[in-house]
């Protein structure tokens, strides 16, 4: 997990109630939200990748059955972290995209920062070059409560306002792509608002909990929102 202090309600990847059974959380010190989102390429160099790899090895040594991360932008570390351990590693919900694109002409992605989620992330998730344009990315308002609290790593967050930001982004995506059926939540802090997104847009909403390697561990708050 990134080193954070913002609230994590049920459904958030960092809330213990989001998972079934025993869950071990390991914080990678020195890696905060902005590091992952706005300098993601830098994560593949220097001490941060080494710290994530070491944390993954420690979790594996403790007997975990699978490992995930707390930020979808960390898909850029997918290969390196999987190479570091033998247990399944799921860095991001974006790994769902190739299978979805095989059955649907377009798939939506809701992200905390549309300005920085680019083709490199989609390619690393396995999206074929010819289908990059079929991924419809929509970000929350960069000046809204959701982005402010999480990217700013603020200990205080108005959850109702944050939820409205996420739903507003989903509605904007629906307006851009009225025939879109499915949306993937890049941000692991968005699942608490999944049901509100469904109610507002009719989208099928998928998240980290829907990745096959993690699905059996996901609890109801993360599945339904």
Question: In which residue ranges do the predicted regions lie?
Answer:
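N-terminal glycine-rich phosphate/adenylate-binding segment common to multiple enzyme folds
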Residues: 47-94, 179-191
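A generic secondary-structure signal
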Residues: 54-58, 62, 99, 168-176
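Conserved beta-strand elements of the Class I
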Residues: 107-110
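A short, acidic, amphipathic alpha-helical segment used as a generic capping/interface helix at domain edges
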Residues: 161-179, 192
């Amino acid at each position: 997990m990134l080193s954070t202090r913002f609230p994590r309600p049920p459904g958030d990847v960092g809330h213990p109630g989001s998972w079934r059974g025993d869950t071990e959380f390991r914080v990678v010190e020195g890696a905060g939200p902005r590091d992952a989102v706005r300098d993601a390429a830098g994560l593949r160099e220097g001490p941060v990748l080494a710290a994530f790899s070491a944390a993954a090895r420690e979790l594996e040594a403790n007997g975990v059955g699978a490992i995930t991360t707390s930020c979808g932008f960390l898909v850029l570390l997918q290969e390196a972290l999987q190479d570091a351990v033998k247990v399944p590693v799921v860095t991001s919900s974006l790994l769902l995209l190739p299978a979805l694109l095989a059955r649907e002409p377009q798939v939506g992605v809701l992200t905390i920062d549309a300005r920085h989620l680019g083709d490199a992330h989609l390619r690393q998730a396995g999206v074929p070059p010819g289908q990059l344009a079929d991924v419809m990315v929509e970000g929350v308002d960069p000046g809204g409560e959701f982005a402010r609290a999480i990217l700013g790593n603020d200990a205080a967050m108005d959850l109702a306002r944050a939820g409205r930001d996420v739903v507003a982004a989903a509605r904007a995506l629906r307006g851009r792509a009225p025939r879109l059926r499915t949306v993937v939540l890049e941000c692991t802090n968005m699942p608490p608002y999944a049901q509100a997104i469904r109610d507002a847009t009719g989208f099928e909403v998928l998240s980290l909990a829907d990745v096959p390697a993690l699905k059996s561990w996901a609890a109801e708050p993360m599945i339904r929102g």
